[in-house]
Amino acid sequence: MQISPLLENLMEALRALPGVGPKSAQRMAYHLLQRNRSGGINLSKALNEAMTHIGHCRSCRTFTEEDECNICKNPRRQMSGQLCVVEMPEDIQAIEQTGQFSGRYFVLMGHLSPLDGIGPREIGLDLLQSRLENESFHEVILATNPTIEGDATANYIAEMCRIHNVKVTRIAHGIPVGGSLEMVDGTTLSHSFAGRRDVSL
């Protein structure tokens, strides 16, 4: 059956989203056209505005429509002396929701992966080096993912920080709150034992 070229284009465009295959794209397209045209128009406007105006913060590399994001511009954040290194911009949002960190960030946009041709420069470590040289940090917190690549990236950055005499810490990894030991994998359990701490009463 021959369908509208515009509908075909819409379905193909929706497939740019992660996890959306042909069937999902078809369902979304028909839903927007049949039941939610105003939502589709709003989506189109928001997508166009975001793609046109959102860039990267010159300091931390997160997404922002300004030259520098609100976190980097915040004087209170600047005074904290802490820098948290994360892999992706969405990691910042996850950390901010905890309310436990009041410093600034640096976004790698990935992790070291020599087999894929991703070296230090590809994840902005030259820019991080510049920040360590030109700004005053008393602690760098490494919040990369607990994967082989994340660990390798954290170790590389830790060495950079030591050269600049900056304290380096890594966020703890272990058993999730409410989790059961029998359901936890061996690697996570090993991290939990390695990161154990004293019980204060």
Curated annotation (Swiss-Prot):
- Does the record carry Nucleotide-binding as a key word? no
Q: Which residues form the Toprim domain?
A: 81-176
Xref: Gene3D superfamilies: 3.40.1360.10, 6.10.250.240, RecR Domain 1
Zn finger limits (C4-type)? 57-72
Which keywords belong to this entry?
DNA damage, DNA recombination, DNA repair, Metal-binding, Zinc, Zinc-finger
Any GO molecular function: zinc ion binding
Which Gene Ontology terms describe the biological processes this protein takes part in? DNA recombination; DNA repair
- The disulfide bonds in this chain are none
NCBIfam families per the UniProt record, alphabetical: recR
Q: Which family does it belong to?
A: Belongs to the RecR family.
- Task of the protein: May play a role in DNA repair. It seems to be involved in an RecBC-independent recombinational process of DNA repair. It may act with RecF and RecO.
Name of the protein this chain belongs to = Recombination protein RecR
